[in-house]
Amino acid sequence: MLAVIGVTNALSSNGSGTLVTIPEPRPEPVAMRMVGYGHAAIAVPKVWGTNASRCGIPHRDTVLIDDPAAASYCDLPRPPDVDSVELGTDPPSGFRVDDTFTLNGVRAERRRTSCSRDGVCWGAVGLPSLHVWFRASSSTSAGVVNEILSRIEILPDRVGVPSSRSPDDGRDGTAYAKRLEELGLKTEISTRTSTVYKPGRLVSISPSPGTLLSPGETVTLTVIK
């Protein structure tokens, strides 16, 4: 949660015995960064972490992108006042279409925000034609969830490095390179050997998924030879 600390108005004398109100200084705007998949992106505070979770449970404000910790299971409570947004290529568990709207000409589906007994609230926005879903959650309030989801944008002149997870290709390097090219990005292939993975397996991506690039920029893929 981002906290804004207010400054109490002060009264001072102008020398004639008249009290003058000193206005509060305006709070500094929160510095933001954009993350996304393809042309769908969302603004998050720069101070947020990336994949700052334990077993997929955020322990501080964070954006979740291909979170490796989500594969583990442990019964951990979410700390209070922690906000997050997760990017996915499929509807999140529990997603339903409560409302629809148009975002920069793209159909969007909204799962209304709801809160559980443990005080964690969540809601989501899906862009089916772009295969991108944003799931925001908060142990602060439902209002924070709605605020997070209001920062989704469609950026025709920017391309977010897509997720490496796909049920269709199983982290196949060739299939992922094709996805990048379809989005207008170039690829550079680096290879390494492995006694664990089969040839063609995608093992690393640089820059990482979620990073916004300009069309024509290069993404380096490391695959097993």
Model-derived segments and their meaning:
Residues 86-158:
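Signature of long, low-cysteine stretches enriched in small and polar/charged residues
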Residues 2-30:
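C-terminal region of N-terminal signal peptides and the immediate post-cleavage residues
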Residues 30-94, 116-119:
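Secretory pathway targeting signatures of secreted, lumenal, and periplasmic proteins
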Residues 142, 150-225:
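Ligand-recognition elements built from short beta-strands and adjacent flexible loops
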Residues 41, 52, 71, 112, ...:
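Disulfide-stabilized extracellular ectodomain repeats and their linkers
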Residues 47-56, 96-102, 107-114, 186-191:
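Short secondary-structure junctions
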Residues 35-36, 125-128, 212-215:
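Extracellular/periplasmic catalytic domains that process cell-envelope and extracellular macromolecules
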